[in-house]
Amino acid sequence: MKATELRDKSAQQLNEQLLELLRDQFNLRMQKATGQLGQSHLLSQVKRDIARVKTVLSQQAGK
């Protein structure tokens, strides 16, 4: 996911995307805790995506 793609979305779409990413992060953390997570890079990838969405939301709120 690119920041330029996110800037084209509305605040409502970004909030929906943020909720989805937070759910994904929770599920990945649970998989890691139970030893079922095979692709550990997904945790950091989702974490960065959450940060991107939050950054774009705060930039849009500042305008």
Swiss-Prot record:
Check the record and name the Pfam families matching this protein.
Ribosomal_L29
Which NCBIfam families is this protein grouped with? L29 (TIGR00012)
Annotated gene: rpmC
Question: What would be one Gene Ontology cellular-component term for the protein?
Answer: cytosolic large ribosomal subunit
Which CDD domains does UniProt cross-reference here?
Ribosomal_L29_HIP
Q: Which InterPro entries match?
A: Ribosomal_protein_uL29 (IPR050063), Ribosomal_uL29 (IPR001854), Ribosomal_uL29_CS (IPR018254), Ribosomal_uL29_sf (IPR036049)
A GO molecular function annotation here is: structural constituent of ribosome
Asked if the record carries the keyword Ribonucleoprotein, the reply is yes
Q: Which Gene3D superfamilies match?
A: 1.10.287.310
Top-level taxon: Bacteria
A biological process (GO) annotation for this entry? translation
Query: What is the similarity comment for this entry?
Result: Belongs to the universal ribosomal protein uL29 family.
Keywords (alphabetical) are: Ribonucleoprotein, Ribosomal protein
UniProt keyword Protein transport, yes or no: no
Protein name as catalogued: Large ribosomal subunit protein uL29
What species does this protein belong to?
A: Ectopseudomonas mendocina (strain ymp)
Disulfide bridge map = none
